[in-house]
């Protein structure tokens, strides 16, 4: 009887190892090639009652910079979205901005021309700084999520 129980344990352990093999084979998520577009989703959660103010400030003081990045080739596309339905407060986000960069290197490094572009786009730097400060004052949360497109190619 002792041998039978020991053999059963070995068979169970082997069965578990065989069943778990596909899990171990999955590995980490696919990463885009260095020369491929790289997408990041930026989520914004504003204070209740200030969502529209946040969006107006974003469109006035940040979106033009993103458009400049499209012109220079740093960014491929920008998409601004909001959810169609309500969520629980802990899961709530008000705006998602998806930016497709030309490649991962451009997405993860600062633009050396950013300060110059900001001064060019907003000559009244005092007003720009004041409005940007306000935009971040009414922001409750912000997080970035790099995403990988896994859609099969035809």
Predicted regions and their residues:
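Bacterial N-terminal signal peptides
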Residues: 9-22
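A cross-kingdom feature marking solvent-exposed beta-strand/loop segments within repeated
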Residues: 81-86
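An amphipathic, aromatic/His-enriched active-site/gating alpha helix that lines ligand/cofactor pockets
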Residues: 27-29, 33, 68-76, 90-92, ...
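Residues at beta-strand starts and edge strands
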Residues: 8, 36-40, 93-95
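Acidic/histidine-rich, surface-exposed loop or edge segments in extracytoplasmic proteins
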Residues: 34-49
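Short amphipathic alpha-helical segments
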Residues: 50-77
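Conserved long hydrophobic alpha-helices within structured protein cores
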Residues: 4, 14, 72-75
């Amino acid at each position: 009887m002792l041998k039978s129980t020991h053999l059963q344990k070995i068979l169970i352990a082997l069965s578990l190892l065989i069943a778990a093999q596909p899990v171990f084979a999955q590995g980490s998520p696919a990463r885009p090639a260095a020369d491929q577009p790289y997408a990041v989703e930026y989520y914004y959660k504003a204070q209740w009652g200030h969502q529209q103010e946040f969006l107006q400030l974003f469109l006035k003081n940040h979106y033009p910079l993103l458009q400049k990045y499209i012109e220079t080739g740093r960014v491929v596309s920008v998409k601004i979205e909001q959810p169609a339905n309500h969520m629980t407060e802990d899961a709530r986000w008000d705006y998602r901005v998806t930016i497709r960069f030309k490649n991962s290197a451009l997405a993860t490094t600062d633009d050396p021309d950013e300060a110059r572009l900001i001064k060019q786009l907003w000559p009244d730097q005092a007003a720009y700084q004041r409005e940007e400060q306000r935009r971040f004052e009414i922001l409750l949360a912000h997080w970035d999520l790099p995403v990988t497109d896994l859609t099969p190619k035809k």
